[in-house]
Curated annotation (Swiss-Prot):
Protein's name in the database: Aspartate carbamoyltransferase catalytic subunit
GO cellular component: a single term: cytosol
Lineage: Bacteria, Bacillati, Actinomycetota, Actinomycetes, Micromonosporales
EC code: 2.1.3.2
Keywords, comma-separated and alphabetical: Pyrimidine biosynthesis, Transferase
Binding residues for L-aspartate: K83, R166, R223
Annotated binding of carbamoyl phosphate, by residue: R55, T56, R105, H133, Q136, G264, P265
Protein family per UniProt: Belongs to the aspartate/ornithine carbamoyltransferase superfamily. ATCase family.
């Protein structure tokens, strides 16, 4: 197993499948009366979040606690970071505390790589700028395999704001490694061809959502990150929804077995309607639940847990 999880590119097919298989074992813990394993007793996991996050931070905290690890949640607000402390000095503090693993979310792309150079423990990238979010890709792959029984050969449409999406980058890399066929869909300004080519030469690009729906096993809708863009990317929210939003009418053009995913948080009424988000095809709630199992697997394998 690798020492850090910084990018989906760190994972070959064998390692990725090992994580997914381990996650399936971890999922059985959720059904127990006592939802705990002693695997990481005595280990310390630090959640170092420089950006606000509800889903991801709580998911990692739950994962570590279910493995009996000691968890330290580091909040930037009110900390030395708010007073100007550098990432390196924070890393040295964590090193002195003996952190076995650091889960980091940071607004700067590449920050987890720097952190990995400064601490002896394992580093897990929980999202760095617009770069990557590998555990989200793993939980998405786990959800697809749970619903559809396989990953190899699946046709996956990743729709929306690819340009600003770390989730899209990690998913394209991981799904391509696992044999899925990925098509990026969205307005041309949000899918630069050079980005698609750099991510995975096998990924296709299409600017017409309606053209890809009948052939898609999975449609992954991305949040439109309006905080990272200006009005030049598309005319209006209404126009975006008309061209690239997934509503009930479009959902009915999907194959009968197809599923709809969204990493959250959603802009209901923009990239996805409530009819779709709350439908039986939607895996959005499952993705949250599966995230805990997948992150348990990642921490367990990175830290060499035992005594399951």
């Amino acid at each position: 197993m690798i020492r850090h999880l910084l990018s989906s590119a760190d994972l070959d097919a064998g390692t990725a499948l090992q994580i997914l298989d381990t996650a399936a074992e971890m999922a059985t813990v959720a059904g127990r009366e006592v939802k705990k394993l002693p695997a990481l007793r005595g280990r310390t996991v630090v959640n170092l979040f420089y950006e606000d996050s509800t889903r991801t931070r709580i998911s990692f905290e739950a994962a570590a606690k279910r493995l009996s690890a000691d968890v330290i949640n580091f909040s930037v607000k009110g900390s030395s970071v708010a007073k100007g402390e550098s990432l390196k000095d924070t890393a040295l503090t964590l090193q002195a505390m003996g952190a076995d693993a650091v889960v980091v979310r940071h607004p700067a792309s590449g920050a987890p790589y720097q952190l990995a150079d400064w601490v002896d423990g394992s580093v897990v990238n929980a999202g760095d700028g617009t770069h990557e979010h590998p555990t989200q890709a793993l939980l998405d792959a786990y959800t697809m395999r749970s619903r559809l029984g396989r990953l190899a050969g699946l046709s996956v449409a990743v729709v929306g704001d690819v340009l600003h999406s770390r989730v899209a980058r990690s998913n394209v890399l991981l799904l391509s490694t696992l044999g899925a066929k990925v098509t990026l869909v969205g307005p041309p300004p949000l899918i630069p061809v050079d980005i698609a080519a750099a991510l995975a030469p096998s990924a296709a690009v299409c600017y017409d959502l309606d053209a890809v729906l009948p052939q898609s096993d999975v449609v992954m809708m991305l949040r439109v990150q309006r905080e990272r863009m200006n009005d030049s990317y598309f005319p209006s929210a209404r126009e975006y929804a008309r061209r690239y939003g997934l509503d009930g009418s479009r959902m009915r053009r999907l194959p009968e077995h197809a599923i709809v995913m969204h990493p959250g948080p959603m802009n209901r009424g923009m990239e996805i309607t409530s009819e779709v988000a709350d439908s039986p095809r939607s895996t959005i709630v499952e993705q949250v639940a599966n995230g805990v199992s997948v992150r348990m697997a990642v921490l367990y394998l990175l830290l060499g847990g035992n005594n399951r």
